Amino acid sequence: TGLAFSFGGGMVNVCLANLSIPVTTFSIARGGDWIDKQAARAVGESVSAVTGWKESYLDLDKRENLSRMEQALSIYYDILLDYVVGHLKTELEKSAVHLENPLTVVVSGGTAKPTGFLKRFQEALQRFQLPIELGEVRLAPQLLHSVTKGALIAAIVDESKKQQKE
């Protein structure tokens, strides 16, 4: 049981599962690439220059004395987080999910790599006052490999079930 977010380059995938059964899942066709393109347009730089700078230097904990690049990336990270969490709130309200215990939230994906991402994400979760209680909010131990590892585990479980039926 938990709430998982995968912040990838091309999209954000979200799944709320209760006892291993997906309750709410959705994808948003925005991710790190979208942030890079928007920031590049805002500061008049190439997307590759923005991406390289972001991957090497971005610190989302820094909030003052920002360069134009830092300002643009900071703004578009906040826009993406608000968009994702706002969509989650809408989905939760539609599904009328009721859970007895606070949900653990796990975040993965390359877009979540910058220092300060988790804090910004937690702030977005608080701003939207979701209709469920959240517990620990944390980064996955291997941001870039967690989704692949989960898919492998699911495939192994499926194969095991098939073999048991035979």
Task: Give residue ranges: language-model regions.
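Glycine-rich phosphate-binding loops at beta-strand->alpha-helix junctions
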Residues: V97-A124, L139-L143
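Gly/Ser/Thr-rich loops at beta-strand to alpha-helix junctions
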Residues: G9-N13, A29, T111-T115
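Residue-level signature of catalytic and energy-coupling elements of molecular machines
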Residues: A39, V107, A151
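Adenine-nucleotide phosphate-binding core of ATP-dependent small-molecule kinases
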Residues: L58-T104, L144
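Glycine-rich phosphate-binding loop plus the immediately following alpha-helix
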Residues: L19-L66
